[in-house]
Amino acid sequence: MEEECRVLSIQSHVIRGYVGNRAATFPLQVLGFEIDAVNSVQFSNHTGYAHWKGQVLNSDELQELYEGLRLNNMNKYDYVLTGYTRDKSFLAMVVDIVQELKQQNPRLVYVCDPVLGDKWDGEGSMYVPEDLLPVYKEKVVPLADIITPNQFEAELLSGRKIHSQEEALRVMDMLHSMGPDTVVITSSDLPSPQGSNYLIVLGSQRRRNPAGSVVMERIRMDIRKVDAVFVGTGDLFAAMLLAWTHKHPNNLKVACEKTVSTLHHVLQRTIQCAKAQAGEGVRPSPMQLELRMVQSKRDIEDPEIVVQATVL
């Protein structure tokens, strides 16, 4: 019998669509993980629509929920997964919870998507309050084992700009020195020999071999861009990286290939369905571009590798 692997996922929840916990829970369950989800917000839909309604969980409410788990001795976890957070006190409470869970299980792996902002047309901007950045740098990242920043977030966390692959590798080394053993820059605008229609994923993993010396594995993936705005892809990426690094703990190349290939299959299915719904020459709406997660169940379970990683 396969050993149970339990994940505490603290992320947003939407009634309709797939972001945050909704983008992470189903795929992880399909891959055999037990998911305990704390919904940091409960919204009708993601905020890319014209309207949304809902409630936001505050740090006291998060503490109360965790206290219920603790009192029942249900705070033994193998993984913690966190994503988008807007509130400084909520983030500080997440740090307290992860620290306590690591005391309960020193082998717990904390997977953090440090959602801070992104680049549009080469210009970066933050979409969370700026006072969250020092909390991420000083408390969250040092506690994390796996982080999945985009290029702009990696630049913010390291205080360094990235203009080349060499600079990206140096930034990843800086992020390793802050704590995490695995750093994956999930998208960057570095040049690709395949043309301007590609974005670059870079990964770096620090491991100890049986002799005790440190081994580094670095990978690069050139991924063709899709001409559409999807929401929830970063949440799905972090969840799939959790799953595939668990299943391939000493092979970042395979873990990233399976993660990126899963996203490829989900996005291709989504864009095909969205275009069919929108009709010829009409740009699909946010509702039509919601990730086709359930329809992609087989691809999530056993993704055909369609994007190869290069070992650097």
From Swiss-Prot:
The modification Phosphoserine is found at S59, S164, S213, S285. The active site is at D235. Keywords: Acetylation, ATP-binding, Charcot-Marie-Tooth disease, Cobalt, Cytoplasm, Disease variant, Kinase, Magnesium, Manganese, Metal-binding, Neurodegeneration, Neuropathy, Nucleotide-binding, Phosphoprotein, Sodium, Transferase, Zinc. Pathway: Cofactor metabolism; pyridoxal 5'-phosphate salvage; pyridoxal 5'-phosphate from pyridoxal: step 1/1; Cofactor metabolism; pyridoxal 5'-phosphate salvage; pyridoxine 5'-phosphate from pyridoxine: step 1/1; Cofactor metabolism; pyridoxal 5'-phosphate salvage; pyridoxamine 5'-phosphate from pyridoxamine: step 1/1. SUPFAM superfamilies: Ribokinase-like. Catalytic activity is inhibited competitively by 4-deoxypyridoxine, and is also inhibited by the benzodiazepine receptor ligands 1012S and ethyl-beta-carboline-3-carboxylate. Inhibited by ginkgotoxin, theophylline, lamotrigine, enprofylline, theobromine, and caffeine. Activity is increased in the presence of K(+)or Na(+). Na(+) binds at D113, T148, T186. Ubiquitous. Highly expressed in testis. ATP binds at D113, N150, Q151, F152, E153, T186, S187, V226, D227, A228, T233. Pyridoxal 5'-phosphate binds at T47, G234, D235. GO terms for biological process: pyridoxal 5'-phosphate salvage; pyridoxal metabolic process; pyridoxamine metabolic process. It is found in: Cytoplasm, Cytosol. One of its GO terms (cellular component) is nucleus. Its EC number is 2.7.1.35. Induction: Transcriptionally regulated by Sp1 transcription factor. Optimum pH is 5.5-6.0. It is linked to Neuropathy, hereditary motor and sensory, 6C, with optic atrophy: An autosomal recessive neurologic disorder characterized by childhood onset of axonal, sensorimotor polyneuropathy affecting mainly the lower limbs, and adult-onset optic atrophy. Clinical features include progressive distal muscle weakness and atrophy, significant standing and walking difficulties, areflexia, neurogenic pain and progressive visual impairment. Catalyzes the phosphorylation of the dietary vitamin B6 vitamers pyridoxal (PL), pyridoxine (PN) and pyridoxamine (PM) to form pyridoxal 5'-phosphate (PLP), pyridoxine 5'-phosphate (PNP) and pyridoxamine 5'-phosphate (PMP), respectively. PLP is the active form of vitamin B6, and acts as a cofactor for over 140 different enzymatic reactions. Belongs to the pyridoxine kinase family. Homodimer. This is Pyridoxal kinase. The gene is PDXK.
